[in-house]
Amino acid sequence: MRLLQFIHYSPDMEDDWDRFVAKSRNGTFIHSRAFMDYHSDRFDDQSVLVISNDEIIGVFPAHAMGSGVASHNGLTFGGILYGIDQRASLVRDMLAGLSDHFTSSGFKKITYKAVPHIFHRYPAEDDLFALQSLNAKLIRRDLSAVIPPNGPGKVSALRKRGQKKAQRNNVVIREGDFYEEFYALLAHVLRKHNATPIHSIAELKLLKKRLPERFKLFGAFENDELTAATWVFRFDTALHTQYL
């Protein structure tokens, strides 16, 4: 087993962290510090860098959550981020070491939400295999679906009728920065379900300013009035509709 060091993240490590995430097998832009730190006031950061032979070989975005740590409730997903050439055995060693590290720091459990392999640069599930071998317990499984670039296949009759209705009413699709209109529409829709937006409008604008190429806002306008919209995350391998 390689000698591994587990170092608590500090702001002076931002560049090293981001460089590793950018070249990792499964890291994405939401694991960059520019994204993670936009709501740093909400979370007690417990992120860790894994070091071997003076090199970063893994990073673990995490925050304190009660008596444990989570990776990561402030992101769509978290988990151990590791290099392209690393073997499954090393990923297991890193996760086992992280468990010991957090236990020695007084934490009692780790809640782990893995990066779906559709977002990996080089898809692999070494971490899921390692978690099983370490007797991790599955507590939740989320539903997701992917539409390939060549289309979803057969389009339902209901969607076809909706498309024709939009065309008759001269609905126009636009990309832009109409965040105030979008946020008002979003809040209105969520109120019907007794819910509120996860992000504030200030946070949406801050993320757009920090990572302008990663966020796209599309709207459907009828007579210049916004009637529907989606806020899209642009990952390296896929587009994700955060709000629709």
Show where each model-derived region lies.
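Conserved GNAT acetyl-CoA-binding A-motif
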Residues: 105-117
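A short, internal acetyl-CoA/4′-phosphopantetheine-binding micro-motif in the GNAT/acyltransferase core
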Residues: 76-88, 244
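Conserved acyl-CoA
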Residues: 92-108
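N-terminal, well-ordered alpha-helical segments
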Residues: 46-48, 58, 78, 96, ...
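A conserved beta-strand-loop-helix scaffold within acyl/acetyltransferase catalytic domains
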Residues: 3-68, 114-244
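Glycine-rich, often proline-containing surface loops adjacent to acidic residues and nearby aromatics
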Residues: 76-77, 107-110, 141
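Conserved acyl-donor/pantetheine-binding loop and adjacent beta-alpha core of acyl/acetyltransferases
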Residues: 66-79
